Regions:
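Post-signal peptide N-terminal segment of mature Sec-exported envelope proteins
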Residues: 23-46
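Extracytoplasmic
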Residues: 38-40, 82-86, 93-97, 139-141, ...
Length: 177
């Protein structure tokens, strides 16, 4: 009976984990300096990232039945990476960036890095942000725009705390003369 209770308790402890922001302090604490070590870590996004790209297709102007017709069309490409989407490291950059892949495909990864003035050490989405228009980044070898809220997206990881303790119980019956 004790063995069953111990096994169930251990399973509950092992399967539990808390998602926390990934920081440069974790890199030091868990010795994650190499890409090989970093490849063992499952990353998650803290919030939804929506990439937008609008491509205008050249139109044609012509006259038909006495009416001038302007033909033009737009192609909109929207990619959504939901909050808590799992990703893996693709590579690391010279300036401490982490390139995280959320899907297969050439160049389909996003860059995250620690902000120079941030004291929390979190890895935030790295894009060229403008206060008025949001940001721009490259994804899948295409330029996409992101809204300014995406700049607050950071990487998260699951941390499991396992505390192992053993005990030995025995009952002393006493001694008789």
């Amino acid at each position: 009976m004790r063995w069953i209770i111990f096994s169930v308790s251990l399973l509950a402890l092992v399967s539990c984990g808390t998602k926390v922001p990934f920081t440069n302090q974790m890199v030091e604490d868990y010795n994650l300096y190499s890409e090989k070590q970093m490849a063992k870590v499952q990353f998650y996004t803290s919030q939804t990232i929506t990439l937008n790209r609008v491509k205008k297709v050249a139109g044609s102007n012509h006259a038909s039945n006495g009416v001038l017709i302007e033909n033009s069309s737009n192609f909109q490409d929207r990619i959504t990476i939901q909050a808590q989407t799992p990703g893996v490291i693709e590579k690391s950059g010279e300036d401490g960036q982490l390139y995280i892949r959320f899907e297969q495909g050439k160049g389909k990864f996003l860059s995250f890095k620690v902000r120079p003035n941030a004291q929390n050490g979190r890895y935030y989405l790295d894009a060229q942000f403008n206060m008025n228009t949001g940001g721009e980044l490259t994804y899948g070898e295409e330029r996409f725009s992101v809204n300014s809220a995406a700049g607050q997206t950071y990487l998260m990881v699951i941390v499991k705390k396992i505390q192992k303790s053993t005990s030995k119980d025995r009952i002393v019956r006493g001694m008789k003369i």
